[in-house]
Amino acid sequence: MSGNDEEFNDEFLLAIDSIETTLKKADMYRPLPPPYLPTFLPAPPPSTKISSSLSHPMQLQSSAGQQRKQIQVPDPFLSYSPPRELSQRVVSGFNDALMDYSNSTVVTAAKPISPTTSNRRCDSEKDLEIDRLKKELERVSKQLLDVEQECSQLKKGKSKETESRNLCADDNRGQCSTVHASKRIDLEPDVATSSVNHRENDSRMALDDKRSFKTTGVQADVANHSDLSKKLLDIWRTSNYQDPRKNLISELLLACSTDLQILFSFMKISTPPQELNKQEAKTSSDRQSSKALESEKVYQLYSAVTKISYGFVNLKTLVEPLLDLCKAETAVLVHRSLRVLHVLLEHICGDEKRFEASWDANWHSLFKLMNQIASKRTEQDVKQEALSIMNIIVMSTDAYTARESFVSKEVFESISLLLRKEGGLHVRKEAIHLFYLLLNCPKLYDTFDSLHEEKNSSDTENDSEGNFFALEAFGKIFEGLADCLTSPRKTSEDLELCRNVIMILALAASSGNSGYELLSSHKLPQDSSFLMLILHLLVAEIDSESTEFHPKAEIFKARTLLMREILILLNRLVSGLSSSATILKELTTSRDMASLTVDAATRLSRKRNLLGKPESSVERMRNTEIMDLARIFKKRVFAFLGDNTI
């Protein structure tokens, strides 16, 4: 029985071996099933042994100690090297190949992974990573586009703000370089804001790559910065309304810095010497008291300048100490005070007209004070400044209503004295300007026109005191004007002075018969008349022009303008219906007058040869306008003489 059992066992083993062989052969020719691996593998028991490296095979042992086949796990990182942030992610193939440690059961069997399945899985993983990279690229591109749009908006805002600042910029063209540097820093707030915002955004993106560029946050930062910039601009930039007192201090410091410095230096008082006799001590004491009084006046001026700079007081507080200093004995104090007062009145009569008046000026008393200073002081610079202030006062008043009130006997006497040679060129110029402004008053102009009837009237009992005063005053002034025409003419200012006199004579001639009589028959010293003086002046300048080959530009211009004014006056006199016969008769009544008239008209009507020199605007005036005026005058004179040939 035992023998039969052994044979049965042998046959049973052979049958099992043949079945296994047949199954193996069938597995070899069977087509591969679709790739499938369990999602999770059970965790091995404590006796299970796993290789430490993923590239080595894993060994699984059962509790019975039977040897199992080794499972080769492919390395999912051998085919490519993805980015760092992607490589930290767990790959699905790796999860499939490994086990889930949450389970405690042992995987008893695992199907081998074929090379074809591994390649397909790697291709699918590559496609997924490519899609993921495309999405990342789209996100970064969108973020970059948002940044570019923000930059363009910032640039547009900067250009608009720059244009608005350029429109508001005012001339305050005496600012120091420190203020200009501060303004320049403030003019570019958007650039600094843009760079700060970009740095903040870069730091935020470095901390969190998933955080995108926030447009709303940037706009809020720009708005906050623009508010701060607007506040700074309100401090630095000129506003629509400014207190004229603040502008006044800046103008005084710019135009009168030297004058104020000299004035403030008089605040120091030296003590009198102690070892002196009584007479010297008394004289020194009187002198010291005078200096102390002047120093006190200067200190009041200093206090007024300080207070008005802070807006505590009005302009009257500044004018009063200046007027007190104008009455001082020291010539330097008077001159410097007049210069500061000159700038102050220019500010009041100019800029302050746009604002509320801060000083109720008594122009008549101020005009009277300046007239006294101009007539009594001997210094030419003091006289000039006083006359300049008088001209400012007259120009600030209305010619039809208020200008007549400034005319007085004292004013006309001062003008006649200031027109003398001893006064100097600049004093004469200011006096002529003052007389021209007063003569432009319609009422005074009518008074000058009525002198012709009053002078021809033999009944002196009917002459009023005012007309007699006007006749005498005008006579002295016109004698001073005639003296200006005979003075030497060496500079352009001398020629300009003569031109101003010709303009006054032209204004007087347009008044009527009195003006024509003034020019033709008014007897001047040395038995001359204004017509003779004018012709002598014109011929003398023609001779000077012909002898100077390369005259200075300013002298040539002043001479050309003088010739033009003389020819305009002569043409007006010889063309008037009521004056032409009288003037032409006076021009040709004597041999000397006729010779001067014909010589001047003939020489000026000829065309000058420039000899290839470039023709300037003054040259064009000399060769066209003056030549035409001379030809018209020549035609009138020759027609009166009976010669119609030109």
Curated annotation (Swiss-Prot):
Record keywords, A-Z: Coiled coil, Cytoplasm, DNA damage, Hydrolase, Nucleus, Phosphoprotein, Protein phosphatase
Biased composition, class Polar residues, residue ranges: 48-70
Subcellular location: Nucleus; Cytoplasm
Motif range (Nuclear localization signal): 119-126
Coiled coil spans: 123-157
UniProt site (Reactive bond): S579, S580
Tissue expression summary: Accumulates throughout the root tip.
Gene Ontology biological-process annotations: DNA damage response; positive regulation of cell cycle G2/M phase transition; regulation of cell cycle; response to aluminum ion; response to cisplatin; response to gamma radiation; response to hydroxyurea; response to ionizing radiation
GO CC terms: cytoplasm; nucleus
Phosphatase tensin-type domain location: 376-646
Stretches that traverse the bilayer: none
Induction statement: Becomes more restricted to the distal region of the root tip upon addition of aluminum (Al).
Molecular function per GO: phosphoprotein phosphatase activity; protein dimerization activity
UniProt note: phenotype after gene disruption: Hypersensitivity to DNA-damaging agents including UVB, gamma-radiation, aphidicolin, ionizing radiation and hydroxyurea (HU). Defective in cell-cycle G2/M arrest in response to DNA damage. Reversed extreme hypersensitivity to aluminum (Al) of the mutant als3-1, including Al-dependent terminal differentiation of the root tip and transition to endoreduplication. Increased tolerance to Al.
Disordered: annotated segments: 42-70
Modifications made to the protein after synthesis: Probably phosphorylated by ATR.
Quaternary structure annotation from Swiss-Prot or TrEMBL: Forms multimers through the coiled-coil domain.
Entry function: Required for tolerance to DNA-damaging and cross-linking agents such as UVB irradiation, gamma-radiation, aphidicolin, ionizing radiation and hydroxyurea (HU), cisplatin (CDDP) and mitomycin C (MMC). Involved in cell-cycle G2/M arrest in response to DNA damage. Required for aluminum-dependent gene regulation and root growth inhibition in an ATR-dependent manner by halting cell cycle progression and triggering loss of the quiescent center (QC).
Homology family: Belongs to the serpin family.
Protein name stated in the entry: Protein SENSITIVE TO UV 2
Organism of derivation: Arabidopsis thaliana (Mouse-ear cress)
